[in-house]
């Protein structure tokens, strides 16, 4: 086969055997035994084959959908606590993908879309829950920060950029993207700035909620393809967002006060009032678990937006015991990750129980939840990770409470010490 751009050996003008265009009308003309094909026809054939493969390949729906119990078990491997939220998420995600598989309505009953709202303090595991679910289902996942979003036409990130990010995660495969999960963080930060609609435009608050409405409920978003046009006749990729699961999360600081105000209405005043003692007061997590749509409206979310997020799960604040478990128990626990890093240098890393408790205590005092654990561990091990590659004979590093409190450096055990200890035992 040869690439003929000039006239043939005989000086004769060559034509594509398929479309009839001459070699001067196309970029490339590929020659075969007494036949020629141009680059445009090759591209057209590729497109036809790709479309046919797409029509056949989505039958991967035949793969068994994990049950809510199986989804919950997978979450348990990576996320500590939050039992109620795990159950709510597992059922909602299972029902969403069940709805996608049974798209033809039975007896005219169309299944509604159930997007999810996660309410919980910073570092309680909202993002990790969404990410772990996407990984267990092997579907594309992307995250967006609501604070960077603005209405179309204003400086900032357009809401449709979220779909662009999802497409990037699956190499612009629209079919895959339409089965994906989108997590929008800091959703509480786009609450309306006051109860009364303002005369001035609120482009990063209520305006963004309005912009997100259609996207979350389901619309056909027009997204520019990677590297310009995919086909000469097509400028945008059409993505049906009604098949995408949206999970929104936020800390909703101060929401508990809104709930308490509602709960206290009707409790009586004067001699008929019910006075609660200190020990009768509910914790913030207990109060948040009683959230109602009206509380979210009072907080600053518009009713239409709340209506698009019918499944609400509240996460509890992690206590010190839970943080200790997070450090050591999950499959990708922090201590296991750092142990793997040290193993690459041929060194075993040991965290003693008192060290784990001290790390958890420090994270609690910083009020950063599980999110602050990594920075604490990184700070403790920084000097050791800097020195170990240059020191020979180290076989073990031990971290105890005094190391966490900054009173001493991690204990380094050398090969010769190990040998002496072994001979002493004999």
Swiss-Prot record:
KW Chaperone (keyword) present: yes
Transmembrane segments: none
Domain of life of the source: Bacteria
Record keyword Metal-binding present: yes
GO cellular component: HslUV protease complex
Annotated residues for binding of ATP: 121-128
Domain ClpX-type ZB: 4-57
Protein's GO biological process: cell division; proteolysis involved in protein catabolic process
GO molecular function, one term: ATP-dependent protein folding chaperone
Keywords: ATP-binding, Chaperone, Metal-binding, Nucleotide-binding, Zinc
Matching InterPro entries: AAA+_ATPase, ATP-dep_Clp_protease_ClpX, ATPase_AAA_core, Clp_ATPase_C, Clp_protease_ATP-bd_su_ClpX, ClpX_bact, P-loop_NTPase, Znf_CppX_C4
Description of how the protein assembles with itself and partners: Component of the ClpX-ClpP complex. Forms a hexameric ring that, in the presence of ATP, binds to fourteen ClpP subunits assembled into a disk-like structure with a central cavity, resembling the structure of eukaryotic proteasomes.
Job of this protein: ATP-dependent specificity component of the Clp protease. It directs the protease to specific substrates. Can perform chaperone functions in the absence of ClpP.
Protein name: ATP-dependent Clp protease ATP-binding subunit ClpX
Origin species: Shewanella sp. (strain ANA-3)
């Amino acid at each position: 086969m040869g690439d003929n751009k000039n006239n043939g050996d005989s000086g004769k003008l060559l034509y594509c055997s398929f479309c009839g265009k001459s070699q001067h009308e196309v970029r490339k003309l590929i020659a075969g035994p007494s036949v020629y094909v141009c680059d445009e026809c090759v591209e057209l054939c590729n497109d036809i084959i790709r479309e046919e493969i797409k029509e056949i390949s989505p039958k991967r729906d035949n793969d068994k959908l994990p049950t809510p119990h199986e989804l919950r078990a997978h979450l348990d491997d990576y996320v500590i606590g939050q039992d109620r939220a795990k159950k709510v998420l597992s059922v909602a995600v299972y029902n969403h993908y069940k709805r996608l598989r049974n798209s033809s309505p039975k007896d005219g009953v169309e299944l509604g879309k159930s997007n999810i709202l996660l309410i919980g303090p910073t570092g309680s595991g909202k993002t990790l829950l969404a990410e772990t679910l996407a990984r267990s289902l092997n579907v594309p996942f992307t995250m967006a920060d609501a604070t960077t979003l603005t209405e179309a036409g204003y400086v900032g990130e357009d809401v449709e950029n979220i779909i662009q990010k999802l497409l990037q995660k699956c190499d612009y495969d629209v079919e895959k993207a339409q089965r994906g999960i989108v997590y929008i963080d800091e959703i509480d930060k786009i609450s309306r700035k006051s109860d009364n609609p303002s005369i001035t435009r609120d482009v990063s608050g209520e305006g963004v909620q309005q912009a997100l409405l259609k996207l979350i409920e389901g619309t056909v978003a027009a997204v520019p393809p990677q590297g310009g046009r995919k086909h000469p006749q097509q400028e945008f990729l059409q993505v049906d967002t009604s098949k995408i699961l949206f999970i929104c999360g936020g800390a909703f600081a101060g929401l508990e006060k809104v709930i308490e105000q509602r709960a206290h209405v009707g409790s009586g005043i004067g001699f008929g009032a019910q006075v609660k003692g200190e020990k009768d007061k509910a914790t913030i997590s207990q109060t948040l678990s009683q959230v109602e749509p009206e509380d979210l409206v009072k907080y600053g979310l518009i009713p239409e937006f709340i209506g698009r997020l019918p499944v609400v799960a509240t996460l509890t604040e992690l206590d010190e015991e839970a943080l200790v478990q997070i450090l050591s128990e999950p499959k990708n626990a922090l201590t296991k990750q750092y142990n793997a890093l040290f193993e690459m240098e041929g060194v075993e890393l040991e965290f003693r129980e008192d060290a784990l408790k001290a790390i958890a205590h420090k994270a609690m005092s910083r009020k950063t939840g599980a999110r602050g654990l990594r920075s604490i561990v990184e700070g403790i091990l920084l000097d050791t990770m800097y020195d170990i590659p240059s020191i020979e004979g180290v076989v073990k590093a031990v971290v105890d409470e005094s190391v966490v409190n900054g009173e001493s450096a991690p204990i380094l055990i050398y090969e010769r010490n190990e040998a002496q200890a072994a001979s002493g035992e004999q």
